[in-house]
Amino acid sequence: MTVERTLSIIKPDAVAKNVIGQIYARFEAAGLKVVAAKMAHLSAREAQAFYAVHKDRPFFKDLVDFMISGPVMIQALEGENAVLKNRDLMGATDPKKAAPGTIRADFADSIDANAVHGSDAAETAAVEIAFFFPGMNVYSR
């Protein structure tokens, strides 16, 4: 087992539903520790930069518009196999295909408003965490 970090974003739809605490409880119940966290209202520039990997995809503009539509809760999570564990907690990107009991099955409205973002690999997680938490403000506990 490998202790690793992953980035999680609770998206504007889930923040608006006031389910941050319920989502955090799921992280902690799965053995993931929140090692950095902040609430932010992303600018268009920040959202475009963060999701730049998708810039040529047809959904890019809608994704950026959604991510700047309200505040988001951004956290770095740490634990055994954190990337996979978080992805299992999130469920399928399309909440209609997400397994019952996953975050997206329980809190997401659509494939666009799908409640959460999670890093897809440890390497991606390192880049994503550095994007939102540059410097020395991520603390193991």
Swiss-Prot record:
One of its GO terms (molecular function) is ATP binding. It is found in: Cytoplasm. Homotetramer. It comes from the Bacteria. ATP binds at K11, F59, R87, T93, R104, N114. This is Nucleoside diphosphate kinase. Keywords: ATP-binding, Cytoplasm, Kinase, Magnesium, Metal-binding, Nucleotide metabolism, Nucleotide-binding, Phosphoprotein, Transferase. It catalyses: a 2'-deoxyribonucleoside 5'-diphosphate + ATP = a 2'-deoxyribonucleoside 5'-triphosphate + ADP; a ribonucleoside 5'-diphosphate + ATP = a ribonucleoside 5'-triphosphate + ADP. SMART domains: NDK. GO terms for biological process: CTP biosynthetic process; GTP biosynthetic process; UTP biosynthetic process. Major role in the synthesis of nucleoside triphosphates other than ATP. The ATP gamma phosphate is transferred to the NDP beta phosphate via a ping-pong mechanism, using a phosphorylated active-site intermediate. NCBIfam families: PRK00668.1. The active site is at H117 (pros-phosphohistidine intermediate). PROSITE patterns: NDPK_LIKE. GO terms for cellular component: cytoplasm. The keyword Nucleotide-binding applies. CDD domains: NDPk_I. InterPro entries: NDK-like_dom, NDK-like_dom_sf, Nucleoside_diP_kinase. Its EC number is 2.7.4.6. Pfam families: NDK (PF00334).
